[in-house]
């Protein structure tokens, strides 16, 4: 099972330092990972699921800080499902998409993430970005996108936690 290495701790510390010098939104993210101007995160331990509601665009540092903390939750609580409300996500820059695909997904799968479902973004570029990420998901994780959040949740409720 994956455990956070010193390298990952160094990466998180570097991201924290960057965010400290960043915007007010970044400072609020540092103060409250679960509810801030960029996203809200809810852990449902009983169903081994994390729900992420994106509220606005995330800078590279914000995006990676959020995902590193999601990874910590996935590993610590043996989360196997993630539900995303991507409605307000305007886009994900290509550099961050590649990072998710090449760096984050493999670690999340190693920790036990098996299913990801999301409500499609409202913006055209958000839809393209999320579609690219989901289509490049590695073996071991099944990703689906839906027009409505309740459809994504219903699908996650049908898959085995295994």
Indicate where each model-derived feature is located:
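Amphipathic, Lys/Arg-enriched alpha-helical "gate/interface" segment within cytosolic domains
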Residues: 2-162
């Amino acid at each position: 099972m994956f455990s956070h290495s010193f390298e990952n701790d160094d990466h998180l510390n570097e991201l924290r330092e960057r965010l400290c010098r960043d915007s007010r939104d970044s400072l609020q993210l540092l103060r409250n990972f679960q509810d801030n101007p960029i996203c809200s995160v809810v852990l449902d331990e009983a169903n081994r699921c994390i729900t992420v509601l994106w509220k606005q665009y995330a800078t590279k540092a914000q995006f990676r800080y959020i995902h590193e903390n999601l990874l910590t939750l996935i590993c610590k609580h043996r989360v196997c499902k993630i539900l995303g409300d991507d409605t307000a996500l305007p886009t994900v820059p290509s550099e961050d998409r590649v990072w998710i695909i090449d760096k984050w997904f493999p670690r999340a799968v190693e920790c036990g993430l098996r299913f990801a479902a999301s409500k499609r973004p409202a913006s055209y570029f958000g839809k393209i970005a999320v579609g690219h990420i989901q289509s490049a998901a590695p073996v071991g994780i099944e990703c689906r996108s839906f027009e409505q959040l309740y459809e994504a949740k219903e699908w996650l409720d049908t898959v085995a936690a295994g």
